[in-house]
A protein has these predicted regions:
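Surface-exposed amphipathic alpha-helical segments
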Residues: 32-44, 198-264
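Bacterial signal peptide processing site
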Residues: 21-23
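Signature of long, low-cysteine stretches enriched in small and polar/charged residues
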Residues: 128-193, 199-208
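C-terminal motif of bacterial Sec signal peptides marking the signal peptidase cleavage site
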Residues: 17-19
């Protein structure tokens, strides 16, 4: 399915103007029984269930901030830890199963007009259920729009707190599919030193595998013009599903997130 540049521009403009719904805010604080860690990578350790992965790759990503890099903030970040889970049960998805650990202080120095506000939004979200934009806070920064979020819940990990939700990112008004949706956790350590970002592919039995087919009853133009209505219908259908119908289950991914320890 092809989308014209003019339709993409209209989609992005509409997303900026209207954003995602903020009627439902995460108010439930969930603390999980922590499994003993069996993976350590730099300053992070956690329990990796064999059902979620059989190996991992640990990398220290060097800082990207030189003057010859475009100033757009997607290309600017501090040295940080990046862990990729291997042999994850879902493959060929938009996001790989990964964890990022960002040092907040250095990141804020590099992006003083972006990061402090994002950190403030996340803190306000987990403490009071409010934030400064239609999108829930998310790292790593990507040049796409957060199409929706569901199952948003404030959760703890060992030494920190954050928000878990299921979402999708898109650069155009494309159909929502299992190729694109992710479970994500965005949190801060209690001492404020680190931002913990987790992205894990997830799938629902009611979504198509790919996003290359128009939803029934839609044309490219009608999907753009009625995209908010389409997204709301998908949100309603997904929220009506039993959490255990997702794969991997939300509970199994929550258990994974709850086992994370940073810098201890």
């Amino acid at each position: 399915m092809k989308i014209s540049l003019s339709l993409i521009a209209l989609f992005i403009a509409a997303a900026i103007l209207f954003g995602c719904s903020t009627d439902d805010i995460p108010t439930q604080l969930t603390a999980l029984v922590m499994q003993q860690a069996n993976v350590t990578c730099s300053e992070i350790s956690f329990y990796l269930d064999p059902a979620l992965g059989g190996a991992y790759e640990c990398e220290t990503v060097p800082e990207s901030s030189s003057s010859d890099i475009p100033t757009y903030y997607v290309f600017i970040y501090p040295s940080h830890t990046e862990l990729t889970i291997q042999k994850y049960p879902l493959t060929q998805t938009q996001f790989p199963p990964q964890i990022w650990i960002y040092p907040v202080s250095r990141f804020s120095e590099l992006l003083p007009d972006v990061l402090p506000q994002r950190v403030s939004d996340l803190r306000n979200l987990v403490t009071g259920g409010t934030w400064g934009s239609g999108e829930l806070p998310f790292l790593p920064a990507i040049p796409q729009v957060q199409s929706f979020f569901i199952h948003e819940t404030v959760m703890t990990f060992n030494g920190g707190i954050g928000v878990r939700f299921i979402t999708e990112y898109s650069e155009a008004p494309t159909p929502i599919s299992n190729k694109n949706i992710i479970y994500t956790f965005q949190g801060l350590t209690d001492d404020g030193k680190y931002w913990v970002a987790v992205t894990l592919p997830i799938s629902s039995p009611i979504l198509p595998a790919e996003n290359d087919m128009l939803p029934e009853g839609y044309t490219e133009e009608s999907l753009l013009l009625n995209y908010n209505s389409y997204v709301n219908d998908v949100i309603g259908a997904l929220e009506a599903q039993d959490p255990d119908s997702f794969f991997p289950t939300i509970n199994s991914l929550d258990t994974f997130e709850g086992s994370i320890t940073v810098g201890q």
